[in-house]
């Protein structure tokens, strides 16, 4: 299926938010799947719309018939080196990224209602989960949530089987100490009461939308991902968990890999679990973005 790509921008609470729309050419049919709002990872402080985890995933899903909007949310400063950045960059800690994402979801809901699936990978999964929880608490409704090798707790769980530990440089960059530092850098001076949206793990998840959770096998963030699945199940949320055998963290950044293909196929199957939402051509063009 052919895909058209358009860069746009919307107004958010912290300034303009760049987005990229991937629209499948549907051959004249008005029966379209829910729109996926997708967030790249990068530890809250790096990443862009051009990295494969954003662009390749969006292209792959759009070719399956799912409209996708990727969000260039504002990035936090480098951990321990935030003083090197601009004053504006230093201020881009929580809740800025969540606010950027919610602005996109709210604008999109004006045209497609609740036919929205919010998702992301790694840090993007954490932002997506926090934004989904806040959107729900503010009266919004989503069709579902897509999460890939995410982490969801302010302090990373300590338990990890030896065979699941990361190798290579990630033994250090994804050590529990480094991950907790990354989280503290993202949270900044936000009050502890904000944690339920910054890091939704351990909070009240009652009524959380139906969720697909893809977990990397050898990943320092896996304990948090597994715990979050258990927390969703404990409150009766619908959650479908898949462990991608042999995978490492960020496998969606490698579009030529088997794990990438497996992950996208699982997403597509899960998105197709219900009948498509009916949408008109007017809906498709009514996102209301400005160049």
Predicted regions and their residues:
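Alpha/beta-hydrolase superfamily serine-hydrolase fold, recognizing
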Residues: 2-291
């Amino acid at each position: 299926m052919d895909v058209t790509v358009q860069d746009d921008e919307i107004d958010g609470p912290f300034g303009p938010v760049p987005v990229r729309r991937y629209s499948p050419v549907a051959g004249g049919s008005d029966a379209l799947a829910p729109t996926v709002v997708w967030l790249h990872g990068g530890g809250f402080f790096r990443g862009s719309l051009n990295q494969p985890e954003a662009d390749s995933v969006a292209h792959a899903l759009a070719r399956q018939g799912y409209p996708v909007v990727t969000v260039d949310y504002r990035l936090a400063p480098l951990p321990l080196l935030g003083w090197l950045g601009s004053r504006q960059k230093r201020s881009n800690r929580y809740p800025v990224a969540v606010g950027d994402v919610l602005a996109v979801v709210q604008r999109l809901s004006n045209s497609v209602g609740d036919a929205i699936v919010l998702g992301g990978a790694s840090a993007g999964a954490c932002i997506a989960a926090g934004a989904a929880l806040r959107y729900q608490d503010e009266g919004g409704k989503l069709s579902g949530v897509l999460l890939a090798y995410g982490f969801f707790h302010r302090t990373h769980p300590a338990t990890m089987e030896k065979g699941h530990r990361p190798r290579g440089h990630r033994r250090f960059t994804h050590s529990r100490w480094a991950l907790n530092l990354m989280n503290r850098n993202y949270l900044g001076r936000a009050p502890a009461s904000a944690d339920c949206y910054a890091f939704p793990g351990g909070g009240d998840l009652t009524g959380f939308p139906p969720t697909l959770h893809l977990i990397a096998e050898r990943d320092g963030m896996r304990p948090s991902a597994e715990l979050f699945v258990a927390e969703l199940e404990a409150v009766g949320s619908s959650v479908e968990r898949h462990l991608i055998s042999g995978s490492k963290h960020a496998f969606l950044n490698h579009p030529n890999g088997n794990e990438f293909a497996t992950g996208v196929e699982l997403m597509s199957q899960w998105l197709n679990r219900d009948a498509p939402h009916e949408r008109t051509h007017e809906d498709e063009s009514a996102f209301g973005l400005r160049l």
